[in-house]
């Protein structure tokens, strides 16, 4: 398991709320919580930036982290990330914030400590562009959106 430096920015973490941990040995994501001062209603169409009470420093340029929505919030309540996916670069050291967007039709209550998103670490490959005039032809070629069919 890779060690990642974390700063606790909110003293409620480790006291009222646990440090993020993997729920099972097969879990890919760590739950991030809303470390807000008081609960509030996220109105339909509204977006708010929510603090998690943590900052991380990955340090390894071969790793990054992504903040992803929790599937139940999106499917059941229409609550997704305002930026769809949050990318945390290996050299970022600031606070982890979650942009929450209510795309549903009803207000959604967010309480202090609610699990609002998940943090997943992913490998990174930095690419260097090689300028060419033509590509080696493939069966797919330039076929894009919907090109491979429904089945």
UniProtKB/Swiss-Prot annotation:
Segments traversing the membrane: none
Chain sites annotated for binding substrate: 70-72, 83, 87-89, 97
Catalysed reactions, semicolon-separated: dUTP + H2O = dUMP + diphosphate + H(+)
Pathway(s): Pyrimidine metabolism; dUMP biosynthesis; dUMP from dCTP (dUTP route): step 2/2
Co-factor requirement: Mg(2+)
GO process terms (BP): dUMP biosynthetic process; dUTP catabolic process
One Gene Ontology term of the molecular function aspect: magnesium ion binding
Coiled coil (residue ranges): none
The enzyme's E.C. designation: 3.6.1.23
Keywords, ordered alphabetically: Hydrolase, Magnesium, Metal-binding, Nucleotide metabolism
Class in the EC hierarchy, top level: hydrolase
InterPro entries the record matches: dUTPase, dUTPase-like, dUTPase-like_sf, dUTPase_trimeric
Entry function: This enzyme is involved in nucleotide metabolism: it produces dUMP, the immediate precursor of thymidine nucleotides and it decreases the intracellular concentration of dUTP so that uracil cannot be incorporated into DNA.
Family the entry assigns: Belongs to the dUTPase family.
HAMAP family: dUTPase_bact
Protein name, as recorded: Deoxyuridine 5'-triphosphate nucleotidohydrolase
Gene (UniProt): dut
